[in-house]
Amino acid sequence: MSTTTPTADDDDVTLYIQDVTLRDGMHATRHHITPENVAVIAGALDSAGVDAIEVSHGDGLAGHSLTYGPGSNTDWEWIEAAAAVVHCAKLTTLLLPGIGTVAELKRARALGVQSVRVATHCTEADVSAQHISTARELGMDVSGFLMMSHLAEPQQLAEQAKLMESYGAHCVYVTDSGGRLTMDGVRQRVRAYRDILDAETQIGIHAHQNLSLSVANSVVAVEEGVTRVDASLAGHGAGAGNCPIEPFVAVADLHGWKHNCDLFALQDAADDVVRPLQDRPVQVDRETLTLGYAGVYSSFLRHAETAAKQYGLDTRQILLAVGERGLVGGQEDLITDIALDLAARQ
């Protein structure tokens, strides 16, 4: 257990920038992207100096389904495309136990994936034991990913993080899937992690922009001792997007934090390559702000918009109802039920 809290005032703060454009960003394009575009983005990220590049369906390996959204290509086609052009960064993927299996993990490893984030709901870390331990056996860098972290109090979340550490995770994330956490919420959770985790266990932050706080939350996290930061080109991701990598890197420069990223190269990739792929602007607007306000899983946005159009509803009505019911990832099908209930009351 750590006895001191690291601070970002130290001259030796070195960040590990994990890009999620090609995983969380899949939600923004309904999991449709060509392997050719994956290669272009992955190559640009590798050249720009990010430490790791995550590639998979938005809901992780084997996420292709009617519930989560069928992809235009398989995980394997996307991973192979990225692996062919990534020479410096660690090729990473996401796995949700119950969706992806150990078999998929092993196949990803064989294709060149070096790092995996094993994701569970914030109170269900115990289901990650087999996948984390197997990843360690495969010689992979392994992180635990506690989704919807705002739904667990700091101490409870830290206890779940400790479980993931005990299974072999090198790092555990505060994962703000709903973009609901404010700076104080992030600060409290990172401190709770640091108080209970071993000093050598790293801590990560995965922020969403739904309340326009993703950069601020990531900065606060680093100030409290986080070293791994998730970000994406142009914030490309579910809901209002992830922490946009360009402004975060700019702020890191202003703080004097060490990293390997080329800011201008990231800006060019964001504006020239990623933004043109978006069929819906990834931004804070009335729908995505409601995600954060109601604490709703960011990937529910497109599902709610589809249901709203089908049943003549305001997307915000659906999202508020989803938040009231406390739906979590994997319950996308219930969005239609909620829409039907709301439509019947009109």
Swiss-Prot record:
Its EC number is 4.1.3.39. It comes from the Bacteria. The active site is at H27 (proton acceptor). Mn(2+) binds at D24, H206, H208. PROSITE patterns: PYR_CT (PS50991). GO terms for molecular function: 2-isopropylmalate synthase activity; 4-hydroxy-2-oxovalerate aldolase activity; manganese ion binding. Residues 15-267 form the Pyruvate carboxyltransferase domain. Substrate binds at R23, D24, S177, H206, Y297. The record marks R23 as: Transition state stabilizer. Keywords: Aromatic hydrocarbons catabolism, Lyase, Manganese, Metal-binding. It catalyses: (S)-4-hydroxy-2-oxopentanoate = acetaldehyde + pyruvate. The keyword Manganese applies. GO terms for biological process: catabolic process; L-leucine biosynthetic process. It is an enzyme of class 4 (lyase). Belongs to the 4-hydroxy-2-oxovalerate aldolase family. This is 4-hydroxy-2-oxovalerate aldolase 1. It comes from Rhodococcus jostii (strain RHA1).
